[in-house]
Curated annotation (Swiss-Prot):
Gene from which the chain derives: adk
Primary location class: cytoplasm
Highest taxon, organism lineage: Bacteria
Lineage, top ranks: Bacteria, Pseudomonadati, Pseudomonadota, Betaproteobacteria, Burkholderiales
UniProt-listed Gene3D superfamilies: P-loop containing nucleotide triphosphate hydrolases
Pathway: Purine metabolism; AMP biosynthesis via salvage pathway; AMP from ADP: step 1/1
Enzyme class: transferase
Cystine residue pairs: none
Protein name (Swiss-Prot/TrEMBL): Adenylate kinase
Family designation: Belongs to the adenylate kinase family.
HAMAP family: Adenylate_kinase_Adk (MF_00235)
Record-linked NCBIfam families: adk, PRK00279.1-1, PRK00279.1-2, PRK00279.1-3, PRK14527.1
EC numbers for this chain: 2.7.4.3
């Protein structure tokens, strides 16, 4: 099972990724984790990546693809792998294809942007303990106060409506085109000797369990 998980920030990809990893016994491939591990290990690609990161520059796609290919050779990828948060752009998807990285499924978790804004901007956090609430879905007993300590709850900057909307705009511009890219490739079939992935789209609305069952059904 080799798959890419697509969906906007706040669509619930992380939660579903955990279910998929457990069910199929595959690792989640995170480019951030890979970069940190390569830098720490001092591998040639890691040293090169560190140069870009220390200069505050983006690590080039070609270098990231090199790290991906190295990572996929490890024994835990024998039964497959799950990409979450990569590729983010058409250029990265093209680079993956050219590198011969095989993908069986592309699974999109579809949630309307208005729902994502409500989900994320309604979050409230107790700073000291990390306990989280939601003004609509999981409200505290007393508005604005932590259930255990009675201390005030905060809204993290990441959860503020304007921040959420900006993240969704970036997703719309950069990553959403991948949905068309993989959908079209699935229809065209094999290219350059690489089998086209099957494209699946599920609704990300409903309970966590309902979405999990939809995901498992889509990956049969």
């Amino acid at each position: 099972m080799r798959l890419i998980l697509l969906g906007a920030p706040g669509a619930g990809k992380g939660t579903q990724a955990n279910f998929i990893k457990e069910k199929f016994g595959i690792p989640q491939i995170s480019t951030g984790d890979m970069l940190r591990a390569a830098v720490k290990a001092g591998s040639p690609l890691g040293v090169e990546a560190k140069g870009y990161m220390d200069a505050g520059k983006l690590v080039p796609d070609a270098l990231i693809i090199g790290l991906v290919k190295e990572r996929l050779k490890e024994s835990d990828c024998a039964n497959g792998y799950l990409f979450d948060g990569f590729p983010r752009t058409i250029a990265q998807a093209d680079a993956m294809k050219e590198a011969g990285v095989a993908i069986d499924y592309v699974l999109e978790i579809d949630v309307p942007f208005s729902e994502i804004v409500e989900r994320m901007s309604g979050r409230r956090t107790h700073a000291a303990s990390g306990r989280t609430y939601h003004v609509k879905f999981n409200p505290p007993k007393v508005e604005g106060q932590d259930d255990v300590t009675g201390e005030p709850l905060i809204q993290r900057d990441d959860d503020k409506e304007e921040t959420v909307k900006k993240r969704l705009e970036v997703y719309e511009a950069q990553t959403k085109p991948l949905i068309t890219y993989y959908g079209d490739w699935a229809q065209r079939g094999e290219e350059n000797g690489l089998k086209a992935p099957q494209y699946r789209k599920i609704s990300g609305l409903g309970s966590v369990e309902e979405i999990r069952e939809r995901a498992f059904e889509a990956l049969k």
